[in-house]
A protein has these predicted regions:
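Peripheral terminal appendages
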Residues: 64, 138-189
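ATP-dependent adenylate-handling active sites, centered on carboxylate activation for C-N bond formation
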Residues: 1-130, 134-135, 150-161, 188
Length: 189
């Protein structure tokens, strides 16, 4: 994905037009923009929302490990969980279709009633690892890291905007930049 500041700015403004509002919308929508832009196929089947079933977010593991169904019900009641609407808008713009099976009612029902321990012990997503052992023998399996963090460097790449002319209020966080985008205070000439 591009690291050029001008390209970043144009892409973030475009994501805003497609519905990005929150920091997570911009940081998670950014790679999806490039996936759909470069996708040769007409349909993308994604794993968006999968982590919610396993309750492996920081918040989930700290506060809801023993109340996993409450955690899931809260997540999946949000019609835009995992930036679903933004992803559908990006797909539509590029005349593509997106299929998000982990957000389907059937998948939500399939996970209903499962516990954190049965899904994640002795390893994160152990239930999936055990059901597809032959496949996972062939690849390196890592623990969960948010899409926009870790080795993707998506979020850290965006921090360059704090040094440029979009930082009109001397923000310390890129969230301020996203708020300026939402208020229509920044643009590209």
């Amino acid at each position: 994905m591009p690291k050029n500041e001008l390209t970043l700015k144009k892409d973030l403004l475009f994501l805003s037009k497609l519905g990005a509002k929150k920091k997570v919308d911009f940081t998670c929508g950014y790679p999806m923009l490039y996936i759909f832009r470069n996708l040769k196929e007409k349909t993308l089947v994604s794993g968006l929302g999968a982590d919610g079933h396993y309750c492996i977010s920081k918040k989930g593991m700290i506060h809801f490990k023993d109340r996993i169904q409450e955690f899931r019900d809260n997540l999946f009641s949000n019609p835009n969980y995992a930036q679903k609407i933004l992803n559908e808008n990006i797909a539509k713009y590029y005349k593509k279709t997106t299929v998000i099976p982990y957000l389907a009612k059937e998948m939500i029902d399939e996970f209903r009633g499962t516990t954190w321990v049965e899904l994640n012990k002795p390893r994160q997503k152990n239930a999936t690892l055990m059901n597809y052992q032959e496949y996972f023998k062939e690849i390196k399996v890592r623990n969960h890291v948010n899409l926009q963090l870790g080795d993707s460097k998506i979020e850290s790449n965006l921090y360059q905007l704090l040094e440029g002319n979009w930082n009109i209020r001397n923000y310390k966080s890129i969230t301020g930049i996203f708020n300026s985008i939402n208020r229509g205070e920044v643009w590209v000439k």
